[in-house]
Amino acid sequence: MSLLLDANVWLAAADRDDAFHDAARRLVHSERIEHAALDLTVYEVGNVATRRWRDPERARRLCLLVLTACRERLVRIGADLAEEAVRIADGEQITVYDAAYVAAARRDGHVLISGDLRDLVERGLALPPDAAEA
């Protein structure tokens, strides 16, 4: 099974206070899953760990985890994906950033997993970490 994990999932796996910590950790460390992520996910997790958590070493480890786990499935943002993300964002009234995850998952046949309940999960655009099988 190929799962595209958004930044919320990678961060939840590293944050014991996150409601999805246990489920996200199982997903991130599962060897039965083909992990995928957007290339921008690396920067987002690094930014949160460095700026919000004030932990550059944790940021470095998280960035490497995403890069290692998604080695062959790190989705690069190109013109076609950006165009589709804008179309989805306009239609769903979500950010283009969130829509990029949706567009990549649809295009490449991944199941999108997100901790963003309001904008992605409740709209049926993604599954929460605790609904996916590790």
What residue ranges belong to the model's regions?
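Acidic, PIN/NYN-like endoribonuclease modules and their adjacent C-terminal/linker elements
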Residues: 2, 75, 102-134
